[in-house]
Amino acid sequence: MDIPDNPMKKLVASGASFIARTHSTQVKHMTEMFRRAIQHPGFSVIEVLSECPVFYKGAFDDGNPRKGGEFEIIDEKTSDGTPEDNEKHDVTSETAAFALADIQYPGKFGVFYQKERPSKNDLEGNLIKTSREKSNNADARKLIEERFKGMR
């Protein structure tokens, strides 16, 4: 028997810059997580938990009470300087996100990690711009053709 994977820990380690968890029965919360992920410039991932109708027959039948424990929302730091704020979750800390990911299933819901940094597209754009400046805006096609001529 092996230890099950922890997708949230893997996401923190992978370098995703927005990581959140929500539940399919909490539509307002899920919508807010999707909104924040869409507005985040960079790689965003949301883990959406849901009752499984395969292993839990009747999970979505009308009037059937939901199972699976509490829906505990992460209390995010607001940086207002109050002592209470220091006890809250810092979404910019990978260490804090890793600790949240360690909480027993189903854990807490909300934003685990959010860090602003240049996206892949921004980094590529800057690389292309810098390269063009270094080559005095030379025609890329001509440079490639010249390079291949030298290989014949």
Would you name each region that the model predicts?
Residues 1-36:
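Conserved thiamine diphosphate
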Residues 15, 41-42:
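Residue-level detector of structured alpha->beta connecting loops
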Residues 19-22, 45-49:
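Short, conserved beta-strand edge motifs with alternating hydrophobic and charged residues
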Residues 25, 51-52:
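Conserved beta-strand edge residues that scaffold enzyme active sites
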Residues 31-32, 40, 51:
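Hydrophobic pocket-lining "lid/loop/helix" segments that shape and contact the acyl-thioester
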Residues 39-41, 105-106:
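Short, well-ordered loop/turn elements at secondary-structure boundaries
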Residues 42-46, 109-111:
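Generic beta-sheet signal
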Residues 52-152:
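Flexible, low-complexity linker and terminal segments
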